[in-house]
Amino acid sequence: MKFIILLFALIHITVAANRALIIDYSYYGCNLDCYIASNQENTCGAHDDDVSDQQYHACLCMNYDYFTNLMNCNCFDSNVYYVSSSICSMATASSEFETYDGAPSTMDVSTTDYSSSTEDISFTEDVSFTEDDSFTEYSSFTKYSSFTKYSSSVSSFTKVIWSTLETSSIKGIAATTSSYFTNAQTTSGTANDSSISKPSGSQIFVLCVISVVGFIFFFLFFLSLFV
């Protein structure tokens, strides 16, 4: 019994060490698609004080390539789902300066030539960006009909998003996500890939040692069953 308790303790320590190791790679450090998505957010004015929140989120919401890269940035599926499903609703938020009231376009929109739509169309009235809805509800979507693939992929993601973000394993993700919607225009956002720190050699060595020791104990336990 003591051996089993020790074995599970080592497994738990190994998992905790692995979480500590990958937290520096949360979201933008995952892969090339995440890096491209980060650059696209900077292009839309993530750290530009002259770009309003509505312009910034509308620029991202209307960028099909951004959603594609974000969907492929799947190191943490629940976080990717949360960001992609919320960013368009942020584009409709009221402001004393302006209110974005347009629909997604097949064109990529930059902040330099952005202008609000004059059409009386609202995301909140016509399309609800939840895990159960599909972009095909909009009959005028042509290129965006491919979002049905995205919707079906998203539906398989975990639905308990906030509870996942609150776990200690991805606290770095929660901080990154929060910076999008509360302080997207400041230079303190974590979207800048220069803030990503890679694990030191000592961290990798410790994790490897813990993993090897855990494997040895597991092997001995398995062997004892037949002796």
UniProtKB/Swiss-Prot annotation:
It is found in: Secreted, Cell wall; Membrane. The gene is PGA42. Keywords: Cell wall, Glycoprotein, GPI-anchor, Lipoprotein, Membrane, Secreted, Signal, Virulence. Glycans are attached at N192. Residues 1-16 form the signal peptide. Probable GPI-anchored cell wall protein that may be involved in cell wall organization, hyphal growth, as well as in virulence. This is Probable cell wall protein PGA42. Induction: Up-regulated upon milbemycin A3 oxim derivative (A3Ox) treatment. Its main location: secreted. It comes from the Eukaryota. The keyword Hydrolase does not apply. The GPI-anchor is attached to the protein in the endoplasmic reticulum and serves to target the protein to the cell surface. There, the glucosamine-inositol phospholipid moiety is cleaved off and the GPI-modified mannoprotein is covalently attached via its lipidless GPI glycan remnant to the 1,6-beta-glucan of the outer cell wall layer. A lipid is attached at S200 (GPI-anchor amidated serine).
